[in-house]
Regions:
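Generic beta-strand structural signal
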Residues: 9-16, 34-36, 59-61
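Glycine-rich beta-alpha junction loops
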Residues: 15-20, 42, 69-73, 81-83, ...
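FAD/FMN-dependent oxidoreductases across multiple families
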Residues: 46-84, 130-131
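Active-site-proximal catalytic alpha-helix in oxidoreductases
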Residues: 70-98, 102-115, 141
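Short beta-strand and adjoining strand-loop segment in the mid-core
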Residues: 26-53
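Rossmann-like NAD(P)(H) cofactor-binding subdomain of soluble oxidoreductases
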Residues: 1-27
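Short, hinge-like loop/turn segments at secondary-structure boundaries
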Residues: 28-32, 81-83, 195-196
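NAD(P)-dependent Rossmann-like dehydrogenase/reductase catalytic/cofactor-binding core
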Residues: 47, 96, 108-196
Length: 196
């Protein structure tokens, strides 16, 4: 419905590096972060992207322009596609997820699958899962957005975070047994709770 209403030529990509929580209707609590990475799908530094970045900077955001917004999007997804559903399944904050060696190894396997998919679609990631875990570790003990949604009884964004990667695995002929297991477990939990 959105794609029909807004043609792709009117879209500027944005990767959000901010943590908020909805406390009540109209009341949002800011936890950390202030970065909104902007970029045209073409990678060009257009006037509209520059104007949008300037507007966001005046509003107090860090708003860098990216020449590779697809890579920035994939990199964020690469971390979120694991810790979000695992936190939703377990109720654990990110520090507890990374502290458990079996869980950390499992999510690393999922990330290796996604890394291979990224390479096949032209969005290589030059890091290893442990490098990304170090980034997540710096954020401290926090509840992911998916865990917050489960606790609030809201639908989970499983398709945007995990299903899409599993589908890309099929399209690129990358085996995804770990991603499949994560998707199956998270989807079943969400269905049982009426959140998917």
């Amino acid at each position: 419905a959105i794609a029909a209403a807004i043609p792709a030529r009117h879209v500027v990509g944005c990767v959000v590096h901010v943590s908020w929580a909805l406390q009540a209707p109209g009341a949002v609590q800011h936890h950390f972060g202030n970065k909104l990475i902007l970029g045209e799908p073409s990678g060009q530094q257009t006037e509209r992207a520059k104007a949008l970045a300037a507007l966001l900077k005046r509003a107090g955001f860090e708003a860098p322009l990216s020449e590779q917004i697809q890579r920035d999007t994939w990199y964020k997804l690469w971390g979120n596609m694991t810790v979000n559903p695992v936190s939703a399944l377990t109720g654990a904050t990110t520090d507890l997820i990374l502290d458990d060696p079996l869980v950390r190894d499992f999510i690393s396997q999922v990330m290796r699958e996604a890394k291979e998919i990224g390479a096949r679609i032209g969005i290589p990631i030059d890091q290893q899962p442990e490098d990304r875990h170090a980034v997540t570790r710096k954020l401290g003990a926090f509840k992911t957005s998916m865990l917050q949604d489960v606790e609030a009884g809201k639908p989970v964004e499983l398709d945007a975070l995990v299903t899409v990667v599993q589908e890309l695995g099929v399209l690129t002929a990358v085996p995804t047994p770990f991603t499949d297991a994560l998707l199956g477990l998270a989807r079943l939990q969400a269905r049982v709770k009426g959140l998917y």
